[in-house]
């Protein structure tokens, strides 16, 4: 069973926490290098891939309402990650499953998300047949602020454990319903288990219409970018990646939507090394595949960043 402690540690976004200084100071250059760990035994390509160069900004000082102002995070170095004996894909378990819960509007393109996740993790990703919310028998409530229905994440995670197929590395439920991890929390965007290979996240609050705001002309691109972030963030947790405190990184925790929007789509050197250690992918080919996807999706800034990483990792950059 996923406890509240686990929910605090691994939730993608939680809202309702009161801003309070936890005395967090961003790690300095030496601490960031120690988090990456020694790379002298790696290939030249991997040494360049995990180098802390200027394409990876360090973690900024959190604002009063940001995640690290409200939650104590000690960080997870690459060495600590290795010692934790995280879940790793093997010859049998190499498929990531996405389980839709409830109805999805046409603009929520699940095939695009499936394709993106396949490029990001360099693994096969399959979308399962959608099921209704009622079929799961999940605990629900009406949020006192939004007056919208919410589903208890712990119930979904328990239900998903029975859905792990023999070839499944993990299974992630995706829904348009709002979520909450326990009665005292306002809501949560997503939650995943670091050890049990199950997770859930919601698209609901990524659409400006949820808050009664007008949808801009590029709102579909905005929703796609947000959905890509939470999908890969939560799946990253199922690989054993904890929240990142070292660089501006996809795996940073976030306490509100604006903070989530500030997070990049990419992994920092520490977290990239963790994922590459687990999945064993070719870093350059992965960057190339992600850049092509982003170009086709109209995410031009992200595509340019990825192409710059291709050059630097190959050794042809300045």
Residue map of PLM features:
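Positively charged n-region of N-terminal signal peptides that target proteins for export
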Residues: 1-6
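Bacterial N-terminal signal peptides
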Residues: 7-17
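N-terminal low-structure segments adjacent to metalloprotease catalytic domains
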Residues: 19-164, 168-170, 174, 284-318
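Generic domain-boundary/flexible-linker signal
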Residues: 107-109, 182-183, 212, 262, ...
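Helix N-cap / beta->alpha transition motif
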Residues: 152, 202-204, 268
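Active-site-proximal segment of zinc-dependent metalloprotease catalytic domains
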Residues: 165-232, 238
């Amino acid at each position: 069973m996923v406890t509240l402690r686990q929910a605090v540690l691994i939730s993608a976004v939680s809202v309702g926490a009161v801003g309070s200084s936890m005395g967090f100071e961003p790690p300095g250059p030496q601490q960031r290098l120690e988090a990456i760990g020694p790379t002298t035994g790696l290939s030249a390509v991997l040494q360049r891939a995990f180098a802390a160069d200027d394409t990876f900004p360090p973690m900024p000082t959190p604002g009063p309402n940001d995640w690290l102002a409200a939650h104590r995070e000690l960080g997870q170095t690459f060495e600590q990650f290795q010692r934790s004996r995280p879940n790793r894909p093997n010859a049998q378990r190499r498929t990531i499953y996405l389980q839709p819960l409830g109805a999805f509007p046409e603009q929520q393109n699940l095939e695009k998300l499936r394709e993106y996740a396949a490029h990001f993790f360099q693994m096969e990703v399959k979308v399962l047949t959608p099921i209704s919310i009622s079929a799961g028998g999940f605990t629900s409530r009406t949020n006192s602020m939004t007056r919208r229905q919410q589903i208890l994440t712990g119930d979904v995670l328990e239900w998903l454990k029975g859905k792990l197929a023999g070839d499944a590395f993990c299974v992630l439920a995706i829904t348009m319903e709002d979520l909450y991890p326990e009665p005292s929390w306002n809501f949560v965007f997503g939650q995943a288990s670091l050890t049990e290979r199950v997770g859930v996240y919601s698209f609901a609050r990524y659409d400006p219409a949820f808050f009664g705001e007008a949808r801009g002309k590029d709102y579909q691109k905005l929703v796609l970018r947000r959905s890509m972030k939470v999908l890969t963030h939560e799946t990253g947790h199922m690989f054993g990646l904890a929240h990142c405190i070292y660089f501006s990184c996809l795996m940073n925790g976030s306490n509100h939507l604006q903070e989530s929007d500030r997070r990049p789509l990419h992994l920092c050197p520490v977290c990239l090394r963790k994922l590459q250690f687990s999945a064993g992918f070719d870093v350059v080919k992965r960057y190339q595949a992600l850049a092509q996807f982003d170009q086709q999706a109209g995410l031009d800034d992200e595509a340019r960043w990825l192409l710059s990483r291709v050059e630097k990792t190959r050794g042809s950059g300045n």
